[in-house]
Amino acid sequence: KRQQSVGDSRLSNFRVLRKTAPDAEGWYLRVPGPSSIENVTALTQVSLNSEIETISALNEAARKRGIIHQIIIMIELGDLREGILPGSLIQFYKAVFQLPNIGVLGIGANLGCLSGVPPSVDQLMQLLLYRELLELKFQKRLPLISAGSSVVLPLSLIHI
């Protein structure tokens, strides 16, 4: 049976999802705040993150639940919305890979989200190269790249 996944930015919607489709995989599409950590690990399996303090708190909450919480680490590529700076990637990932109850699914960026400027091929290539660098450095597969909302779709379809 194929896994169903639902992405949302509201934890209240995941409360409903747990009742209606308890086996569906939940992707929390907002960087969790300190007060939402317990709910994020209780209601979702995957979240987007860019702060080591938040990821450490998710690790502790996941440990208490006896689960591995999956994350996509967001990288800042010019939209100035969220994400770690590319120069910090190696140190950041090294710290995250030390956390036993966190699994890293991949990297992401919010391209074209706030500025309204369409993302470029160069930005997509940067994400691909950062993933390759991290996979080679840490010998860990990062299967997913999240490049943003539907604004990225035309660009990705042209260049796949």
PLM ranges: what are they?
Residues N39-T44, L48-I55:
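Active-site beta->alpha loop and helix N-cap motifs at the rims of alpha/beta catalytic domains
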Residues K1, A61, H69-Q70, E76-L157:
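Active-site loop/helix belt of alpha/beta enzymes
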Residues F14, S56-A61, R65, P118:
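Active-site-adjacent beta->alpha loops and helix N-cap segments on the catalytic face
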Residues L11-S12, P32-P34, I52-T54, S149-L153:
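Short beta->alpha connector loops
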Residues K1-T44:
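N-terminal active-site wall of soluble small-molecule enzyme domains
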